[in-house]
Curated annotation (Swiss-Prot):
Catalyzes the cleavage of the interphenyl double bond (C alpha-C beta) of lignin-derived polyphenolic diaryl-propane type compounds (Stilbene). Optimum pH is 8.5. Active from 5.5-10.5. It comes from Sphingomonas paucimobilis (Pseudomonas paucimobilis). 1 Fe(2+) ion per subunit. This is Lignostilbene-alpha,beta-dioxygenase isozyme I.
Length: 485
């Protein structure tokens, strides 16, 4: 008989759902723009069985992939588990066999040495396939329409790295998928690699290099000429695993680094720039103006996770709030200092997104989730530590911003931009995001006019179920699905 822990990561608004299914023609409130023809894929952690340990955490769940298929003013829905090696062997056993988050020392003996990946962090269509990703394991390939799992890939045996990041970027000019790996030669190793995959899914390059210290490298930036790696001291070690401590611990005594690697260079061309201790979040975008390299992302004074502190200090939710910030370094300089640090937005924010047609280049428009602690929250159980209750838009050319609050009983999941047409100007289009009603226990996929989010949704696809809090997802126009059709 299944019994999930009554802990914050497995109860209330984060209670596991474990639902697979299909819905044709979801009920719509308003009108879906009829020209939208494509897919929105997103993923959330959702353990298929109760964890081996009561103190397990949210990020350790099996990947559950959701597909919203837009066509003819309608939206269809499909949801399936990413059938990783872990998922399959536990399905056969009828119970969890893998232990604590990223700790192989806690696994059942029967699965020692197996790939522990859950494919629960991000999904993206590339080369006609759906890439399901988690940064501690290889990339999992799925069919973007049926959501059937094909299996892990090492790109025809050519990729040497054992892991594949969860936040690749597609260069809009070349069509290449730009990615990286950390722990590339095994858990706790300093080995990293910068990776590019062709539009047809072939490995083009894998540039190995070393990290200053082993840490969580969740996201990165890519410009026209450079790969940009923000390194923060969210650390791990075998000692931590042997003591059954949480996998990561944030060390407030160590500096942060920004690594700049020419995309057409090698490890000898890599430069590290240094700054003071801080916590960095997801990357909005990066670009370079000659030798000057810029990366935009939320930056906070201290650890943003309430359960990761190497010194045991209590979580400080104020110091942990991130604000969209631009770091600038100059590859023509002789030193290792930042040229400039500039805050771009004065409200605490996360999950930043852009018009992906402007990825790797100078850009103007951005969207993000805002943590508005001044707004009330009236759902049972109280808010979890980072309630993303507001959707924001910023125009970096004018500095103007607008926002929409979801209401006192709702949270918003990561937004995603869709161009109005392939040749529409930057930022002209729609933003979609799941809005979770924590009282009614339903989720709506809300559609906004991208530059007028303050006016609220122009349409809602009303699901008859709640979709568990997710991590990341992406839009793919129908033309990118042609190979898979």
């Amino acid at each position: 008989m299944a019994h999930f822990p009554q802990t914050p990561g497995f109860s209330g608004t984060l209670r596991p759902l474990r639902i697979e299914g299909d819905i044709l023609d979801i009920e719509i409130e308003g009108e879906v723009p009829p020209q939208l023809n494509g897919t929105f894929h997103r993923v959330h952690p959702d353990a298929q069985f109760p964890p081996r340990f009561e103190d397990d955490q949210f990020f350790n769940g099996d990947g559950m992939v959701s597909l919203f298929r837009f066509h003819d003013g309608k939206i269809d829905f499909r949801q399936r588990y990413a059938q990783t090696d872990k998922w399959k062997v536990e399905r056969k056993a009828g119970k969890s066999l893998f232990g604590a988050y990223r700790n192989p020392l806690t696994d059942d003996a029967s699965v020692q040495g197996m790939i522990r990946g859950t494919a629960n962090t991000n999904v993206m269509v590339h080369a006609g396939k759906l890439y399901a990703m988690k940064e501690d394991s290889p990339c999992l390939i799925m069919d973007p329409l049926t959501l059937e799992t094909e299996g892990y890939t090492n790109f025809d045996g050519k990729l040497q790295s054992q892991t594949f990041c969860a936040h690749p970027k597609i260069d809009p000019v070349t069509g290449n998928l730009c990615a990286f790996a950390y722990g590339a030669k095994g858990l706790m190793t300093l080995d990293m690699a910068y990776i590019e995959i062709s539009p047809t899914g072939k490995l083009l390059k894998e540039i190995p290099f070393q990290n200053p210290y082993y840490c969580m490298m969740h996201d990165f930036g890519v410009t026209e000429d450079y790969a940009v790696f923000a390194v923060m001291p969210l650390l791990s070690s075998w000692d931590r695993l042997e003591q059954r401590l949480p996998f990561f611990g944030f060390d407030t005594t160590l500096p942060c680094y920004l690594g700049i690697l020419p995309r057409n260079g090698d490890a000898r061309d890599l430069r590290w720039f240094k700054t003071g201790n801080c916590f960095v979040g997801h990357v909005m975008n990066a670009f370079n103006d000659g030798t000057k390299v810029h990366i935009d992302m939320p930056v906070s004074r201290n650890n943003s996770f309430p359960f990761f502190d190497v010194h045991g200090a209590p979580f400080d939710p104020v110091a942990g709030q991130g604000f969209l910030t631009r770091w600038t370094v100059d590859m023509a300089s002789n030193g290792d200092s930042f040229e400039k640090t500039e805050r771009l937005f004065d409200r605490p924010d996360e999950f930043p997104r852009i018009d992906e047609r402007y990825a790797t280049r100078a850009y103007r428009h951005g969207w993000m989730l805002i943590l508005d602690t001044e707004k009330p929250y009236e759902a049972p159980g109280g808010a979890f530590y980072a309630l993303t209750n507001t959707l924001g838009h910023i125009d970096l050319a004018t500095g103007k911003s607008s926002s929409w609050w979801a209401g006192p009983r709702c949270a918003i999941q990561e937004p995603c931009f869709i161009p109005r047409s392939p040749d529409a100007p930057e930022g002209d289009g729609y933003v979609i995001a799941l809005v979770d009603d924590h009282v009614a226990n339903y989720s709506d996929l809300a559609i906004f006019d991208a530059q007028h989010v303050d006016q609220g949704p122009i349409a809602r696809a009303k699901l008859p179920v709640r979709i568990r809090q997710g991590l990341h997802g992406n839009w793919a126009d129908a033309s990118r699905l042609a190979v898979a059709a």
